Amino acid sequence: MKNIQILFQTLNIFPKNLVLYKQALTHSSYSNEQTPPQEDNERLEFLGDAIVGLLMADYLYSQSKEDEGIMTKKRAQAVCEKSLTIYAQKIELQNYLLLGKGEKNKDFNAKGIMADTFEALFGAIYLDLGYLTAKKVFHNIVLPHLAKTIYIIDFKTQLQEIVQSEKKTIQYKIVQEQGPAHSKNFVAEVYLEKNLLGTGEGSTKKSAEQKAAQQALSKVAKTKDLIKNKGVKEKEL
């Protein structure tokens, strides 16, 4: 096990309660081998799971105007076990982990141990140094690798990029709204000038627009021809 002070230097933090960090780095397999048993990281993992999810939700909400569905999918991918393991490896968290003899020779990445430890670490940082410090550390670790862990397709952005490459603009129009206030259904259409590119339905206006953009992209060759003014039947607004 490396000197934990090196980890603190990597994270650029100045801890007040070292006991919390030792606990965060103590796997239950190690704890059970001690006499008396030491407190393991499972409770901090529980707290850290919520903190990590909140930090990612906070970031996604502040950085975009995407609808709830897209942000939910992005958050799920960004803080899934595989992604958390990647973040843990980037700070070499495995070098500080206290593992029992039976676990040391196993692939603890595959078992989710590193992901759990990453969450426990953020539980410790939150309790010791507060939300703002946890947020700063989280951003420093996660944001450089976010593009590799999020694979959500934003159809509106894709369509917009195609249109902008031809120096054109598109317009979304909500053409239908049905249902009670608690269970609305919307129909959206996306136009290039007077040409209908796609139609979509959704429980929110933004999700309907995403579906409309997706339909336009599914006919990408025809859409590109339209954008380049090669002649496609028009529908009047």
Swiss-Prot record:
Gene Ontology molecular function: any one: ribonuclease III activity
Principal location listed in the UniProt entry: cytoplasm
InterPro entries the UniProt entry points to: dsRBD_dom, RNase_III, RNase_III_dom, RNase_III_sf
Protein name per the record: Ribonuclease 3
GO cellular component, one term: cytoplasm
Cofactor(s) listed: Mg(2+)
Record: residues binding Mg(2+): 45, 116, 119
Subcellular location as annotated: Cytoplasm
Gene Ontology BP, a term: tRNA processing
Function: Digests double-stranded RNA. Involved in the processing of primary rRNA transcript to yield the immediate precursors to the large and small rRNAs (23S and 16S). Processes some mRNAs, and tRNAs when they are encoded in the rRNA operon. Processes pre-crRNA and tracrRNA of type II CRISPR loci if present in the organism.
Similarity remark: Belongs to the ribonuclease III family.
Annotated PROSITE patterns: DS_RBD, RNASE_3_1, RNASE_3_2
Active site per the UniProt annotation: 49, 119
Subunit structure: Homodimer.
Source organism (scientific name): Aster yellows witches'-broom phytoplasma (strain AYWB)
SMART domains the UniProt entry points to: DSRM, RIBOc
Highest taxon, organism lineage: Bacteria
Keyword DNA damage: no
Domain DRBM: 154-222
E.C. no: 3.1.26.3
Catalytic function, reaction form: Endonucleolytic cleavage to 5'-phosphomonoester
Short name of one Pfam family: dsrm
Alphabetically ordered keywords of this record: Cytoplasm, Endonuclease, Hydrolase, Magnesium, Metal-binding, mRNA processing, Nuclease, RNA-binding, rRNA processing, rRNA-binding, tRNA processing
Domain RNase III: residue ranges: 4-130
